[in-house]
């Protein structure tokens, strides 16, 4: 089975163009998985997750890899305050744009913190969290 990514942009509020790759397989979709990458020089969804998306897609998941605001091919507003609320707002706008009512979130590093923040703000929209080397988690 060949899985071909489709690169697109979601035009969101304040002129934000959020870039994403969507991987569709030819089998019935089980659920939607959103991959949220971490930060760092050259960070993007594809650079973080290029070795993971095929496995999910081949199991029948609708798989979407986003470039978070400020990274990859997504808009990089210079006047924005890149807070957790900023990222979760745009993640929610993206899910609404794609008509996704519930998703599995996979977050790496900063992406994990965004996934946690999103799950806390919108618990009904997240079915599962998969976290890797996540920031924003306190040890108690």
Model-based region annotation:
Residues 43-55, 92, 105-114, 134:
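Conserved SAM-binding loop
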Residues 40, 78-80, 135-136:
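Flexible, active-site-proximal loop/turn residues at the rims of small-molecule/cofactor binding pockets
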Residues 13, 21, 58, 62-106:
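Active-site loop/oxyanion-hole signature of alpha/beta-hydrolase fold enzymes
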Residues 16-73:
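Conserved HGGG/HGGXW glycine-rich cap/lid loop of the alpha/beta-hydrolase fold
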Residues 47-48, 76-77, 118-119:
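Short amphipathic alpha-helical segments
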Residues 1-18:
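N-terminal cap/lid segment of alpha/beta-hydrolase-fold proteins
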Residues 100-140:
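Conserved hydrolase catalytic core segment
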């Amino acid at each position: 089975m060949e899985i071909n990514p489709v690169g697109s942009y979601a035009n969101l509020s304040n002129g934000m163009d959020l870039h994403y790759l969507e991987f569709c397989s030819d089998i019935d979709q089980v659920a939607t998985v959103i991959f949220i990458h971490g930060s760092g020089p050259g960070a993007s969804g594809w650079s973080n997750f290029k070795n993971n998306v095929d496995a999910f897609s081949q199991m029948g998941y609708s798989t979407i890899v986003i470039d978070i605001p400020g990274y990859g091919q997504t808009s990089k507003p210079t006047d924005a305050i890149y807070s957790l609320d900023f990222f979760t707002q745009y993640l929610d706008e993206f899910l609404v744009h794609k008509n996704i009512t519930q998703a599995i979130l996979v977050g790496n590093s900063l992406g994990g913190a965004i996934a946690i923040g999103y799950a806390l703000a919108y618990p009904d929209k997240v079915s599962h969290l998969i976290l890797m080397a996540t920031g924003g988690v306190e040890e108690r």
